[in-house]
Structure formats: structure tokens, C-alpha cells
Design a protein with these regions (language model features):
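Short amphipathic alpha-helical segment that frequently serves as the phosphate-/nucleotide-binding helix
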Residues: 19, 40-44, 168
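Extreme N-terminal starter segment of soluble prokaryotic enzymes
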Residues: 1-4
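N-terminal Rossmann-like NAD(P) cofactor-binding module of classical short-chain dehydrogenase/reductase
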Residues: 26, 114, 149
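Conserved catalytic scaffold of divalent metal-dependent phosphoesterases
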Residues: 10-14, 32-36, 45-49, 56-135, ...
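Binuclear metal-dependent phosphoesterase catalytic core
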Residues: 86-90, 138-143, 147, 154-188
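Conserved acidic residues
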Residues: 23, 30, 53, 111, ...
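Di-metal (Zn2+ and/or Mg2+/Mn2+) metal-binding site signature of metallo-dependent hydrolases
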Residues: 10, 28-41, 152, 156
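A short, aliphatic-rich alpha-helical micro-motif
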Residues: 19-20, 107
């Protein structure tokens, strides 16, 4: 299974025109800039039109109008809003934790975890400060998903492996919210 990671596109998603082939595309939040309903609808229409059989997304700190949403009605087949919930695709267990929600919601047995926030001290440093979430780090290292995909801290874009977990900060934007990086592709 090939998984394409997007994150932190801040209303610039339509500029992503040459995306690689994948089985699943995930967006780790901050698909909007101001979190308005209009911005969310624009993103959802674009995301639904991508040529991938499975599309998964979680909210980020900019996606304000969806922070408390429990779901989104009438999503196309294969598109999942993983707001504190999971789905299974070809035997692979995905789970998405909404921005700033408690890490205790992450169940055991997850293969691919999507969050917006990074775990503390792992691809989370900006301007000399670590912005990650310490309880999230503890829970991720308990659950040990094969992949933990996130964004949020634009300057900390990168991949690292720790205790058999691949951590990926897939933020595509720079500090001025301009797209400056290519999406990352993983093979599972």
C-alpha cells in the first residue's frame, strides 16, 4: 500500500497539480487558513476530486469550523473524516486524532496514526522551541503504530524513526504559509 502525506496546505491545495500515484492520500490538517466554512468546502471539493481510492483527513489548528464536528455528512465513498475515529483499508488500521484532543482516544492496534500536532521533541522545533505534545509522545510510543503522520510545525519538516515507529512531519508550507515542499510517499 502506498500512502501519500499532505499537511499544512493553508488554502493552497489547488497548487498541488502533479501528485504521485498512491492508494491512500492523507491530509494532516491546516487545509484552510482562517477555518471558514467556505474554505472547508473548497478543500473538500478538491480533495474529493483527487484520483485516489481512499482519502483521509484530520483537522488542524487553522480548521476552526470543524474543531467540534463529530462527522461530515455525505462524503463520497472512500473519503473519511478521521475526527477521533479510525477506518480499516485492506487490513491496515488508520486512526485520526483531532487537533488538541486527548491522546487517550488513540486505541491500541493502530498501524497508521494521523494527527496535526507532533509529539514533543520529534520534528517539532521552531525558533529554538519544541512545540510538540508530551502526552501524545507517550501514547504513540505505547501504541507503536508503524507510521505517525502529522504536520503543524512548518520548519520541522522531515522524517525520523524511533522505537520502530516512523515519524513524519509533512508540513508543505513555510513560515509564511507558502507551499515550498513536495508531498511525501510511504510504502506500507
Amino acid at each position: 500500500m502506498r500512502i501519500l502525506q499532505l499537511s499544512d496546505t493553508h488554502n493552497q491545495h489547488t497548487r498541488l497539480t502533479e501528485l504521485p500515484e498512491a492508494d491512500v492520500v492523507v491530509h494532516c490538517g491546516d487545509f484552510t487558513e482562517n477555518g471558514t466554512e467556505e474554505e472547508v468546502l473548497d478543500f473538500l471539493n478538491w480533495f474529493a476530486g483527487l484520483p485516489y481510492p481512499h482519502k483521509l483527513f484530520v483537522t488542524g489548528n487553522h480548521d476552526l469550523c470543524l474543531w467540534d464536528a463529530e462527522g461530515i455528512e455525505d462524503l463520497p465513498d472512500g473519503m473519511h473524516f478521521l475526527q477521533d475515529r479510525g477506518c480499516v483499508i485492506d487490513g491496515v488500521r488508520f486512526f485520526g486524532l483531532a487537533y488538541n484532543h486527548p491522546e487517550s482516544l488513540i486505541p491500541d492496534g493502530v498501524d497508521v496514526l494521523l494527527t496535526h500536532e507532533p509529539p514533543v521533541m520529534l520534528l517539532d522545533k521552531s525558533a529554538g522551541t519544541h512545540w510538540g505534545n508530551a502526552p501524545l509522545r507517550r501514547r504513540v510510543l505505547e501504541v507503536k503504530p508503524r507510521y505517525h503522520l502529522f504536520g503543524h510545525v512548518h520548519e520541522a519538516w522531515g522524517v525520523m524513526k524511533m522505537e520502530d515507529v516512523v515519524f513524519s512531519n509533512g508540513a508543505l508550507a513555510d513560515n509564511c504559509n507558502r507551499l515550498c515542499r513536495q508531498p511525501r510517499l510511504f510504502a506500507l
